[in-house]
Amino acid sequence: MAAGGDHGSPDSYRSPLASRYASPEMCFVFSDRYKFRTWRQLWLWLAEAEQTLGLPITDEQIQEMKSNLENIDFKMAAEEEKRLRHDVMAHVHTFGHCCPKAAGIIHLGATSCYVGDNTDLIILRNALDLLLPKLARVISRLADFAKERASLPTLGFTHFQPAQLTTVGKRCCLWIQDLCMDLQNLKRVRDDLRFRGVKGTTGTQASFLQLFEGDDHKVEQLDKMVTEKAGFKRAFIITGQTYTRKVDIEVLSVLASLGASVHKICTDIRLLANLKEMEEPFEKQQIGSSAMPYKRNPMRSERCCSLARHLMTLVMDPLQTASVQWFERTLDDSANRRICLAEAFLTADTILNTLQNISEGLVVYPKVIERRIRQELPFMATENIIMAMVKAGGSRQDCHEKIRVLSQQAASVVKQEGGDNDLIERIQVDAYFSPIHSQLDHLLDPSSFTGRASQQVQRFLEEEVYPLLKPYESVMKVKAELCL
C-alpha cells in the first residue's frame, strides 16, 4: 500500500493539533497551500530580480507567473513527485505547466533550498508574528487579574506546605514575570531571523556568478533584492546548502521555554482548584465526569500541561538535527523538520489560546482563602504575639514557653481530632496574655502579614508589564474561544 493518505478522510490519521486544537490561522501558515504558494512567490521574486539585473526574462513571463501564483494543481504535483521522487522539481514542473512561456526560467540558477529553506524562514517569521500578540493578550488578562487582587491576602506555599502570606495578585505576578520573559525572547528570536537568500547549491553562489558572467556586484544585488522582497532586513552571508540548523534550535528553545512557563502556571491553577481557592472557567453544560456528576475538573489547565510537556520535548529534535548536518548538509534534517517545526508552533498556539481562555474567566473564592488563612495564621502570628507581650512588660522566655504549650495543644486538636485551630481562643482565655487581649485582632490582621506584596504588584505592572504590552494595544480586544 502506498504511503500517505487522504487526510480529510475519517479513515486516515490526522494530527489532533490540526484537527482538534490549533487555530485556523496557525494551521494555514503550515498548510501545503501556504507552503507551495510561497515557493511560487519566491520563484517570481527571483525572476523579477534577475530581470532587473539584466537576464533575458520578459515582462510577459513575469506576468504569467504572477497570474498563476494561486493556480496550484495539487493532484498534478503529487503525481509528479511520485514520478520524480523530488518535491521541488515536482512543483517546478507543475508551475511550468500553467506558465508555459515562463517554464524555462522558473528556478533559474537556484537549488531546492532556495524555495525550501527560504519558505521555512518566512513561515517561522509569520508563525512567530501570530504567537506574539496571543502571548501579549494572556499577559494582559493576567495583569488585569493581578491588579484587581493585588491586596487580597492568601496563604503562600513553599514545598506545598503553608508559608508566609502573600497576595493573590502577587502570586499571579510570578506567572506574568515568566511570560514577559517569554514574550521578550519570542520577539528577540523573531527579529534575529535572517533570510537564507540566493546562495546556490553549497552556499557559494557559483551558479549565479556564472549567470551574471562573473559580476560579483550583481550577485550581491540579486541576494539583497530577493531578501528585501521577502520582507527581511538581512540575509546570511555564510550558508551551506541550507541555512544553519542552529536557527531551528533557537526558535524551538524559546517555544519550549514558553511551554515550561505555561505548565507551571496551569499546575498552580490545578492545585488551587483542589484547594477550592480558584477555578478555571466551567461552562453551564460542561460535564466533569461521566460517573461523578459533582466533579469540576480543571480540564483546560490539564490540557495545557499535557501539550506543554510535548512542546518542551520537541527542542531535542533540532538539537540532534543540527549535530548531524555533515559538511554542507545531509538530508537527516528533512523529514524531522517537516514534523517538529509545525508541531512546535501548533502546540504553542494551542496552549496560548487555551491559557487566554482560562485567564479571561478565572474565578476566585475569597471566603475559602480566608478560612485557610484562619487555619494557619495563628501559628504564624506567634512571633508577633511574643513581641507584643514583651512590649507590655512580659518575659520573652516565659511567653515563648506559654505559646509553645498552647500551640501544641491547638495542633493536637487540628491533627488528632480534625478540629479547627483554636490557638487564639486559648490565648484569649489565658490570664497571662490579658495585657494584649485587646491587640489580638490587630495582630491577626492578614494584611499585616503580606509585606509589600501589593506595592510590588503595582510597581511591576507599571514599570515592566504595561510598557512591554504597549506595541500590542491594537490587538488586545480579541477574545479566545474554545470549541473543545
UniProtKB/Swiss-Prot annotation:
Pathway: Purine metabolism; AMP biosynthesis via de novo pathway; AMP from IMP: step 2/2; Purine metabolism; IMP biosynthesis via de novo pathway; 5-amino-1-(5-phospho-D-ribosyl)imidazole-4-carboxamide from 5-amino-1-(5-phospho-D-ribosyl)imidazole-4-carboxylate: step 2/2. Changing residue 447 to P: In ADSLD; severe. The enzyme reaction kinetics indicate cooperativity between subunits. Changing residue 194 to C: In ADSLD; severe; reduces protein stability. Belongs to the lyase 1 family. Adenylosuccinate lyase subfamily. One of its GO terms (biological process) is aerobic respiration. Changing residue 100 to A: In ADSLD; moderate. Ubiquitously expressed. Both isoforms are produced by all tissues. Isoform 2 is 10-fold less abundant than isoform 1. Changing residue 426 to H: In ADSLD; severe; most frequent mutation. It is an enzyme of class 4 (lyase). Changing residue 246 to E: In ADSLD; moderate; strongly reduced catalytic activity. Catalyzes two non-sequential steps in de novo AMP synthesis: converts (S)-2-(5-amino-1-(5-phospho-D-ribosyl)imidazole-4-carboxamido)succinate (SAICAR) to fumarate plus 5-amino-1-(5-phospho-D-ribosyl)imidazole-4-carboxamide, and thereby also contributes to de novo IMP synthesis, and converts succinyladenosine monophosphate (SAMP) to AMP and fumarate. It comes from Homo sapiens. Changing residue 452 to P: In ADSLD; severe. It catalyses: N(6)-(1,2-dicarboxyethyl)-AMP = fumarate + AMP; (2S)-2-[5-amino-1-(5-phospho-beta-D-ribosyl)imidazole-4-carboxamido]succinate = 5-amino-1-(5-phospho-beta-D-ribosyl)imidazole-4-carboxamide + fumarate. Keywords: Acetylation, Disease variant, Epilepsy, Isopeptide bond, Lyase, Purine biosynthesis, Ubl conjugation. The active site is at 159 (proton donor/acceptor), 289 (proton donor/acceptor). This is Adenylosuccinate lyase. The modification N-acetylalanine is found at residue 2. The modification N6-acetyllysine is found at residues 147, 295. Homotetramer. Residues from neighboring subunits contribute catalytic and substrate-binding residues to each active site. There is a cross-link at residue 415 (Glycyl lysine isopeptide (Lys-Gly) (interchain with G-Cter in SUMO1)). One of its GO terms (cellular component) is cytosol. PANTHER family: ADENYLOSUCCINATE LYASE. Its EC number is 4.3.2.2. InterPro entries: AdenyloSucc_lyase_C, Fumarate_lyase_CS, Fumarate_lyase_fam, Fumarate_lyase_N, L-Aspartase-like, Pur_lyase. The lineage of its organism: Eukaryota, Metazoa, Chordata, Craniata, Vertebrata. Substrate binds at residues 20-21, 85-87, 111-112, 241, 303, 329, 334, 338.
